[in-house]
Amino acid sequence: MVFDYAKITRSRLMGSMGLIIRYEEDEKYIYQYFLLDGEGLGIADYVSLKNPTSKEACREEERLMGGLGESRVLVDEEIALFLINHFGNKNLEYGKDLPGDVDEYIKIITDYKSNLTLNQVYPIISKPIEDEVEFINYMTMSINIW
């Protein structure tokens, strides 16, 4: 498989991020959709589509990312794989089941090595808080979680 692109929502401050990776193999596309839970749960959802129509791919993207309310940014393969590894290891650490067809991504969790750190990736997956209203919304969400 050849990496085509990956994109993620900049919604880490709200707790969850949607990540999509698209690969190409034999002129067919494989989409992997991950819901990453930054509040300790790891990978919360996973779906893959093999050679979907454009409409099917868009529908799954909106199901995954539409409610997260933030912009989507392209990331390189190293960042995408780092995030899957990082959040997948949270599932293992907390004894939570990995979702979906685990065989499709388990090697990323068990075998992928990167020199990246979460501190390096954090500015990419988080939108800066730019005004008082955003700060109040963030604090309200944070307090309600506890």
Where are the model-predicted features located?
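Non-catalytic terminal/accessory regions
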Residues: 1-146
